[in-house]
């Protein structure tokens, strides 16, 4: 084992240890969580595997040891933007670094090879495709490579959302070297199965593993199902013209229309998608990075490897195709540690768009037909998980962390679900109407139709297709005419989530499941959590005046809150705010129905905490009778 006082021998100085390098070269006084463990592993000659959230400091785990090890560190990355930005930052810090990728001209590449052979670089970034180039192989065999860092390591797994067959060649490349170097794998988004794949395929040897967790506590998550996405977007951006943010759209056409909308309303917005020329993309990206433009409207082609720390919000105008993609894109907010918002605008049309893009996508030409079909199948599975996120009423942060296999508190206190006020509503009648409509449409046509057409039928729309198919004549036509489009689709989504409906993927047609019979024929009750968006008639403040007796009960309720919070390992305010406890002390509810009328008590919190607080109130009343 090498000791951790291995000296720094690069051109930056002599004899520096890691703490001194961290401060003097990179400007940090201390390591972030997990960094030192991985760095020590590399310096001791062990393979390492780091799973850290976006903005968690992965690059330090290979940049710093590169300066302390003899020879060269090779960083394999698919991100051209990241290569350029990190090499630029390293050079500014005085670290000799270079990148080798397709953006270099022939003469530039030859000059880089000469400098490499002359020992003028400590860190070299390469794209995985470069490993197969004959010219590169001839240069590499003459080098002393002490460390290979594989960035975005999830790309090696077919279970990963960004599978790249070129990553599978990395092991062959390592095996071809005269001496096997230390190997490190780094990623921000990897489920348990992807982590296992990475370790197995890269043939990591008893690696030092560090999973710092996927949680980004400074990010606020919310899903909104608006009537008008444009109006909602403008409302969200009101008063934020000086803040930097990214708005992701699913298609180039939508990027253009949203960017135009924002510019028309006085926002300094620019755009980014694959349909623009490389020169325009580069200019627009620089305008955003250097704050000449504050809002970037883009497809998912934007952002990989972009290291802009002051992004205050990421809004998804459309639903992404996977949790991995969403968390990676949303994670570009708040990289400076400041509070930031991650908002997703969702409607049923997003599901259709995502399925179309998956079923018709051919953006990875490295794959053969069999690989593409397998990836398509996995992408559809990931899409189902993403749809679940958009429809859940449980903690959004918890949903994401569950997906990545990380334990978490029941409530985070910093997402739309935890801060929302939900009430359970009986929708049995509406459910029977919807399920009956699905059946009657099939009886009339001999086939099933999609959610949009069902919604039009139920709301009594004079839609041309409804009339052409004669669906304005069936008995369920117009029975939900008093409901908004959003309400109707929310109920359709809920019935699917509860297992009464299923959507066939190929044509997005909606079918009844066997469970639907329980509601249609046996009167099973169906309830649905609905967010109460109105303001309470009489807002209760924390400073509300309490009688002496009420103040005593208030103190008892605070003690119970603290006890529950400690058990759940969450902040006390996440259980209930002081304002809610004050209202509770004044109203002294005796039943669950009364408890739900306390300001700040929603259906979910009532289910979790109601019994304990009701017992506390009753005990207090008994003792003071």
Name every feature range the model reports, one short phrase each.
Residues 42, 237, 288, 390, ...:
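Short helix-to-turn junction characteristic of helix-turn-helix DNA-binding domains
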